Curated annotation (Swiss-Prot):
InterPro entries for this protein: RNaseH-like_sf (IPR012337), YqgF (IPR005227), YqgF/RNaseH-like_dom (IPR006641), YqgF/RNaseH-like_dom_sf (IPR037027)
Protein's recorded name: Putative pre-16S rRNA nuclease
Keyword Cytoplasm appears in the UniProt entry: yes
CDD domains: YqgF (cd16964)
Entry's family note: Belongs to the YqgF nuclease family.
Organism, as annotated: Polynucleobacter necessarius subsp. necessarius (strain STIR1)
Enzyme category, top tier: hydrolase
A GO term for molecular function: nuclease activity
Annotated Gene Ontology cellular component terms: cytosol
Stated role: Could be a nuclease involved in processing of the 5'-end of pre-16S rRNA.
Amino acid sequence: MLKPMALITPITAMAFDYGTRRVGVAVGNSVTKAGEPLKTIAAPNSDTLFKDIEQLLAEWQPNQLVVGHPTHPDGAPHEMTAKAIRFGNQLHGRFQLPVAWVDERYTSAVLEGDAQMRDNLDAHSATLILEQYFSELDTNLNTKAAD
């Protein structure tokens, strides 16, 4: 069965690994299903952070934003959960782009063991978040196509 056109329209997504001191950013598209780490923003305040993000959005023109949803290993929320949700809501409010949430448990832990990743850990974490989003999107599209 062919998928309807709406289901195969390419998505350019920008993902964020939110932290109170640094925010990792990655970009990718649904055609390659791969993400590319862009940068880690070390912003002293939210004005600086959102100005940097605005520049990245202007450059890459994503039509979807993805934010990592941090929780404890058992899925329970912790102190960063509400902060990440607030950040995602601010992204949506400021830039009028849809925001998707992706479980980010273990993304940093997976990368911390890789010495090459440590220098830009947050941006690489955002890449994993983005690739997880594409994987989940693919799974959802395949499920809908089978219905």
